[in-house]
Amino acid sequence: LDPVTKAPADCNTKEDVRAQIDRIDQGLLTLLAERHAYVTRMAEIKTDPHEAYDPTRIEAIIAKQRKRAEELDLDEDQAELIWRTLINWNVNYEKGIIAARKRHG
């Protein structure tokens, strides 16, 4: 069963808090899977593995996420670390898909 959504202030036990964190984690994984589907589609559209790495686009994404993190009162450096990890994962995945397609024609 999905736990009932509670505001942080309404969580009175560690179990309450953990249930909410687990609920959010499931949502994050669902969003990552959705994002990954778009990354896969991008890899299908791109024709050269070098296209997977676009430093200008990456830095624009990082700047946008740092700003959003600040607006949400989150640590911008930690947000950047998370996004760089996500971007590196996606870039490497795209490169692999594109390179495999080029090899197999």
For each predicted feature, which ranges?
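Domain-level signature for soluble enzymes in the chorismate/prephenate branch of the shikimate pathway
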Residues: 1-105
